[in-house]
Amino acid sequence: MSDLDTLLMETLAQVAFAADEGELENVRVGALGKKGTISALLATLGKMSPDERKVQGAAINALKDKVNEALAERRLILKEQKLEARLAAEIIDVTLPVLPRPEELGRIHPITQVMDELAAIFAEMGFAIAEGPDIETDDYNFTKLNFPPDHPARDMHDTFFFEPDAQGQRKVLRTHTSPVQVRTMLTQKPPIRVICPGRTYRCDSDQTHTPMFHQVEGLVIDKSAHLGHLKWILEEFCKAFFEVPDVKMRFRPSYFPFTEPSMEVDIQCSRKGGEIRFGEGEDWLEILGCGMVHPNVLRNCGLDPDVYQGFAWGMGIDRIAMLKYGMPDLRAFFEADIRWLNHYGFRPLDMPSLLSGLSS
């Protein structure tokens, strides 16, 4: 056995027995470092004849390559062993009780709670939930909803527009959840009965407005849907949501591009002592907008307005949450203040239902 074979066996043995990356690095330096054994052999090549240098150079380089290969393999094994040891040390036994934390229980955000309340109320009336993308086309957000080209909502100061695409079309962050109604009418055949909750976006920010907020809209399409049905649905919703035995509502004429006639709805309330109470008093508070779906919207969605008609409504989820639970500032909803959430949040297992109470 030649000296090179002996050196290779000894070096490979040292590599194999290296217990960690530190020991492996010492082996590498001892063999391939500036003063290493293999480096020393390479330094002797200059004293050899050309023929000897050719033979010995090839042999020493082959030795060096084998050592480098062994070092790389061992390094990979050691890294895997280190990872396995760390994972074993960090394993969590899910059968054991959770260790105490400063916040022993999380809280459900009021917006999530109110969305669940809305779903529970309208599910009892036979409504399904429809959802759509936050980023919408101008066609779905405006055109199919009968917005005229010069409507203020199409202005940059009111709507978040994206840069035009290659075809020159601009997408928007949806300004309402009405595009979900459009998508529903385009993909489903009547009768339709859905609510559309979700995030919406507008260029506005103050104590009662934020650039992102939450909205729920409702849509009913059928051959005989009329304002009487709309009035009953909204009255039943308000009684269930605000948990009062009776409510008085008034419908005021208004204008929305996508409904005709259009109305805004006020609910009777009392403001005594700085507290708003529904179902009593002599004051009125606006809570939502509604109306019969405009014939142009039906046509844009492939429905014959001579056969089908329907109604729709929309309200701010953040706003009705503030009214029901006495929250004075909308901006606090998005500040992630654990103290605020502990005060206004809900227990995780409190699932709203009309039978057990929405906010019990």
UniProtKB/Swiss-Prot annotation:
InterPro entries: aa-tRNA-synth_II, aa-tRNA-synth_II/BPL/LPL, Phe-tRNA-synth_IIc_asu, Phe-tRNA_ligase_II_N, Phe_tRNA_ligase_alpha1_bac, Phenylalanyl-tRNA_Synthase, tRNA-bd_arm. Binds 2 magnesium ions per tetramer. It comes from the Bacteria. GO terms for cellular component: cytoplasm. One of its GO terms (biological process) is phenylalanyl-tRNA aminoacylation. The keyword Protein biosynthesis applies. It catalyses: tRNA(Phe) + L-phenylalanine + ATP = L-phenylalanyl-tRNA(Phe) + AMP + diphosphate + H(+). PROSITE patterns: AA_TRNA_LIGASE_II. Keywords: Aminoacyl-tRNA synthetase, ATP-binding, Cytoplasm, Ligase, Magnesium, Metal-binding, Nucleotide-binding, Protein biosynthesis. It is found in: Cytoplasm. It is an enzyme of class 6 (ligase). Mg(2+) binds at E260. SUPFAM superfamilies: Class II aaRS and biotin synthetases (SSF55681), tRNA-binding arm (SSF46589). The keyword Nucleotide-binding applies. GO terms for molecular function: ATP binding; magnesium ion binding; phenylalanine-tRNA ligase activity; tRNA binding. Its EC number is 6.1.1.20. Its cofactor is Mg(2+). Pfam families: Phe_tRNA-synt_N (PF02912), tRNA-synt_2d (PF01409). Its main location: cytoplasm. HAMAP family: Phe_tRNA_synth_alpha1 (MF_00281). Tetramer of two alpha and two beta subunits. Belongs to the class-II aminoacyl-tRNA synthetase family. Phe-tRNA synthetase alpha subunit type 1 subfamily. This is Phenylalanine--tRNA ligase alpha subunit.
